[in-house]
C-alpha cells in the first residue's frame, strides 16, 4: 500500500458536484493498493498515518500526531499511486490492484482508522473525484508499506 499524506487546514472531495467528504484541520491521505497487500500493510499504513508527528507543539516543532491534536482524516482511493512512468509517455497501472479486492482493502483501512480517529471522511471508491486541499506548511509525505521509499 502507498499513501500521499498531506497536512491540511481543510480538505474536501466532490463527486458529480456534490461534497461527499470534508474535514478541517487534519490529514488528507491518498491511498493506493497493489497485489499482495494484506492486513499487515493496512495496519502499517494506518499506524504510520495516525501517529506521524507532523503537527506543531507549543514550541512550533513538528512533534504532535493527528491523534494528539484531535485532527480529522480524509481518505481518498487513488490507484494512480502505482503508476509506472519509467517507459514511454503513458503511465502503466498494472501494479494497481483493481476491483472488489482493492475496494475491500480500502474499506478495511478506513474501518481501522475510524476505530482510532473520531472524524474520518472518505471519497467514493472508484469514482472520478474533485479534491480540494488547503495544505498546511506545506507538509507532504510519501509512505509505502513495503518501504520502497
UniProtKB/Swiss-Prot annotation:
Chief site of localization: cytoplasm
Domain comment quoted from the record: A Gly-cisPro motif from one monomer fits into the active site of the other monomer to allow specific chiral rejection of L-amino acids.
Subcellular location(s) per record: Cytoplasm
Keywords: Cytoplasm, Hydrolase, RNA-binding, tRNA-binding
Reactions catalysed, as given in the entry: glycyl-tRNA(Ala) + H2O = tRNA(Ala) + glycine + H(+); a D-aminoacyl-tRNA + H2O = a tRNA + a D-alpha-amino acid + H(+)
The keyword Cytoplasm is assigned to this record: yes
Cellular compartments per GO CC: cytoplasm
Known EC number: 3.1.1.96
Record's subunit section: Homodimer.
Organism per entry: Clostridium acetobutylicum (strain ATCC 824 / DSM 792 / JCM 1419 / IAM 19013 / LMG 5710 / NBRC 13948 / NRRL B-527 / VKM B-1787 / 2291 / W)
Annotated motif Gly-cisPro motif, important for rejection of L-amino acids, positions: 137-138
Stated name of the protein: D-aminoacyl-tRNA deacylase
Gene3D superfamilies the UniProt entry points to: D-tyrosyl-tRNA(Tyr) deacylase
GO molecular function ontology, one term from the record: Ser(Gly)-tRNA(Ala) hydrolase activity
Record GO biological process: D-amino acid catabolic process
Disulfide-linked positions: none
Pfam name, any one: Tyr_Deacylase
Family as reported in the entry's similarity comment: Belongs to the DTD family.
